[in-house]
Amino acid sequence: MYTPSYLKYSIISIISVLFLQGTHGDDGGWQGGHATFYGGEDASGTMGGACGYGNLYGQGYGTNTAALSTALFNNGLTCGACYEMKCNDDPRWCLGSTITVTATNFCPPNPGLSNDNGGWCNPPLQHFDLAEPAFLQIAQYRAGIVPVSFRRVPCMKKGGIRFTINGHSYFNLVLISNVGGAGDVHAVSIKGSKTQSWQAMSRNWGQNWQSNSYMNDQSLSFQVTTSDGRTLVSNDVAPSNWQFGQTYQGGQF
């Protein structure tokens, strides 16, 4: 079959562009930012935080955690997301290794300081305040602050999603943690065994989700949707005799 010469050149051009995009593209999703550290050598100062996870050791997050600047935190919706990160462009301090951290806290802006002199977390900077043990995996302590390349990666978690039920009757505050896949939860619905339909929960703060319905004395199911649009249903996670302050484990992405 005859193919016009101009069409041949067009096809070759398209193939060349696709090849280059496949080779380089957006550099695998890598973006540029900076990292500092906090929390002490045992990361005890990172416990709690704006995502609501509490004891990061007990919740399974360990010390590979980060507080995100305003530009990344998204008012708490990014809590639970995972980032692959490496120190770069500073051979004096960079160790050449790569780590994966989970977003567990917020690094607040400091408008009284300039962006390049202490106001590291000021908008629009993309900044990670790492737990000290995490920082020391990619850079030397004396560096203080280093340039990094980072990208979102799937979260690899052991066990199922955890639902910690706090609050009281007519105020169910559910902390959702240990979420795999995208990691950051953007929508949650709850259903009791005595109710007819799913009820959307509202995000109270961090990854604490709220329902004002009376859910006592019935088993509870949860529907969790992450930022990538995937939804997972965990049926009858909490038995009918569930108690406030207890944690129940569901399925996993």
Curated annotation (Swiss-Prot):
Pfam families: DPBB_1, Expansin_C. Transmembrane segments: none annotated. Disulfide bonds join 51-79, 82-155, 87-94. Residues 170-250 form the Expansin-like CBD domain. InterPro entries: Expan_Lol_pI, Expansin, Expansin/allergen_DPBB_dom, Expansin_CBD, Expansin_CBD_sf, RlpA-like_DPBB, RlpA-like_sf. SUPFAM superfamilies: Barwin-like endoglucanases, PHL pollen allergen. The keyword Ribosomal protein does not apply. GO terms for biological process: plant-type cell wall loosening; response to herbicide; syncytium formation. It is a peripheral membrane protein. Belongs to the expansin family. Expansin A subfamily. This is Expansin-A8. The gene is EXPA8.
